[in-house]
Amino acid sequence: MQFFKDILNGSDLFDGEWYKETYPDVARLGMDSAEHYLKYGWRMLRDPSTEFSTKFYLKFNSDVKSAGVNPLIHYITQGVNEG
């Protein structure tokens, strides 16, 4: 989990403060923003920032969706190089 949290936190496409402000239930849970997005948020089609649309990415990358892969992690580690 820490490996993937580090990937998110090192990316301009993940904004932990924005995530907590946009989804106040995360703050109420006292959960780390990156951990929430990794475990639950992307499955709830929540966006990790204003710069990345989870729903859009999954819509146009059905292989990622059907594989159950976190869309932002996929984009950062593979998708950005796929074009």
Description of each model-found segment:
Residues 1-83:
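Charge-rich, low-complexity intrinsically disordered regions
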